[in-house]
Swiss-Prot record:
It catalyses: NAD(+) + ATP = ADP + NADP(+) + H(+). Changing residue 175 to K: Does not exhibit NADH kinase activity in addition to NAD kinase activity. Competitively and allosterically inhibited by NADH and NADPH at physiological concentrations, whereas inhibition by NADP is only slight. Inhibited by p-chloromercuribenzoate and HgCl(2). Homohexamer. It comes from Escherichia coli (strain K12). HAMAP family: NAD_kinase. GO terms for biological process: NAD metabolic process; NADP biosynthetic process. This is NAD kinase. Changing residue 175 to I: Does not exhibit NADH kinase activity in addition to NAD kinase activity.
Length: 292
């Protein structure tokens, strides 16, 4: 065993037997290598592991040096919002569909992870967004997002009227089905489907992408990640909400604004040494191959 990582957490929310098989393989392999292993409580229960050290996501974040998330991008997003608050590196084994964030191949994960544990990896920081629903700058409800914060109707699709302020300066008003505020990490997710640009992960930028705007002049906007975005509403209807990574929803009541800014902490994401962001884009999005 090397000194790069001593304590490793195993994280995920298994939905099918193949994911559980990967969890069990990973646990037993790490134990034979002499690492201290903490297994997320739900996984330990599903696998019926005995005499195993378990913990919540927060406890894994506090105690472990590395968290291995087994699952798809949704599993990674759910775990990473919590793990990003702690000094822990995170890597993913893909058991989902696209796998933009979980880039270890499950069929070759053991060898790839062995190289990572030896210190052969690429490290990068991904910033998060913090969203607040507040009234007169009094914080009421707050959440974070790794991919995006989305303004949308609560139940029935309809047009929304709102104003956008950037650093407290009026930028534009809009009538649309909603607005996607995305990080570079989220630029290949919901934002991409809505016609937003792809941003490389190292960019300190945020995109604002209209959803079905009621004007042909509405276009995606890219701003500095240090900016604060404020959304104000006409409140002709009271069923609006924002969602974070399509996993957490915060309702918006009459008289409330939404504030969105970059979080103070980052997700410490790591990849195998041969990782290439552009190769990932080409593979996942079906881009053309090299001509010569």
């Amino acid at each position: 065993m090397n000194n790069h990582f001593k304590c490793i957490g195993i994280v995920g929310h298994p939905r099918h037997p193949t994911a559980l098989t990967t969890h069990e393989m990973l646990y037993r392999w790490l134990c034979t290598k002499g690492y201290e292993v903490i297994v997320e409580q739900q996984i330990a229960h599903e696998l019926q592991l005995k005499n195993v050290k378990t913990g919540t996501l927060a406890e894994i974040g506090q105690l472990a040096d590395l968290a291995v998330v087994v699952g798809g991008d949704g599993n990674m997003l759910g775990a990473a919002r919590t793990l990003a608050r702690y000094d822990i590196k995170v890597i993913g084994i893909n058991r989902g569909n696209l796998g933009f964030l979980t880039d270890l191949d499950p069929d070759n994960a053991q060898q790839q992870l062995a190289d990572v544990l030896e210190g052969h990896y690429i490290s990068e920081k991904r910033f998060l967004l913090e969203a607040q629903v507040c009234q007169q700058d009094c914080q009421k409800r707050i959440s974070t997002a790794i991919n995006e914060v989305v303004l949308h109707p609560g139940k029935v699709a309809h047009m929304i009227e709102f104003e956008v302020y950037i650093d407290e300066i009026f930028a534009f008003s809009q009538r649309s089905d909603g607005l996607i505020i995305s990080t570079p990490t989220g630029s290949t997710a919901y934002s991409l489907s809505a016609g937003g640009p792809i941003l490389t992960p190292s960019l300190d930028a945020i995109t604002l992408v209209p959803m079905f705007p009621h004007t042909l002049s509405a276009r995606p906007l890219v701003i500095n990640s240090s900016s604060t975005i404020r959304l104000r509403f006409s409140h002709r209807r009271n069923d609006l909400e924002i969602s974070c990574d399509s996993q957490i929803a915060l309702p918006i009541q009459e008289g409330e604004d939404v504030l969105i800014r970059r979080c103070d902490y980052h997700l410490n994401l790591i990849h195998p040494k041969d990782y290439s962001y552009f190769n990932t884009l080409s593979t996942k999005l079906g881009w053309s191959k090299k001509l010569f």
